[in-house]
Design a protein with these regions (language model features):
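Hydrophobic faces of well-ordered beta-strands that scaffold small-molecule active sites
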Residues: 14-18, 57-59, 94-97, 117-119
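Non-catalytic positions within long, well-ordered alpha-helices that form the structural scaffold/packing
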Residues: 47-50, 109-110
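Alpha-helix-loop-beta-strand connector modules within alpha/beta enzyme cores
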Residues: 10-11, 16-17, 68-96
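Ligand-binding beta-strand-loop-alpha-helix segment within the catalytic cores
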Residues: 86-87, 93-96, 100, 108-110, ...
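Active-site mouth loops of central-metabolism enzymes
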Residues: 19-44, 94-101
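Generic hydrophobic/aromatic pocket-lining and core-packing "Φ" positions
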Residues: 46, 83, 105-106
Length: 129
């Protein structure tokens, strides 16, 4: 049995993407917003994904645009906070990604005990955006 099959309990897992709303420090962060609003939106999305039957969940800062090759400390701190707030509600294998920053992704995943990740780490900076 492969590592992925043992983690997800299926040979072809469906991994749902939980895109966090813009975080503090992001250009698109809502004026007058709060991290608790980001947490509440993430909880709603998490519930919908798990209810929908996904085999795993990847939590990302997809809306931290424009993407940077080095994620800011405020983004990492905010992601860690939001993931901590979601941790008791996660019932499927889950991972995290700090978009386009492999080092920050590994640091974040180690800090929050993520079970897997996806990241750009090999020096190829190509994408669809």
């Amino acid at each position: 049995m492969s590592f992925l099959t043992s983690m997800f309990k299926t040979e072809k897992p469906v991994i749902g993407m939980l895109h966090l709303r813009p975080l503090p420090g992001d250009p698109l962060y809502y004026p007058g917003g709060s991290v608790s609003q980001v947490v509440e939106a993430a909880k709603r999305d998490l519930e919908a994904l798990q209810r929908g039957g996904v085999d795993g969940i990847l939590i990302t800062n997809e809306l931290s645009m424009p993407y940077e090759q080095h994620v800011s400390p405020s983004t990492l701190a905010s992601m860690g906070y939001v993931i901590g707030a979601l941790s008791h509600d996660l019932s499927t294998p889950w991972g995290a990604e700090a978009i386009y920053d492999g080092d920050a992704t590994i640091e974040l995943c180690a800090a929050v005990d993520a079970q897997f990740t996806r990241c750009n780490f090999c020096g190829a900076w190509a994408g669809d955006l």
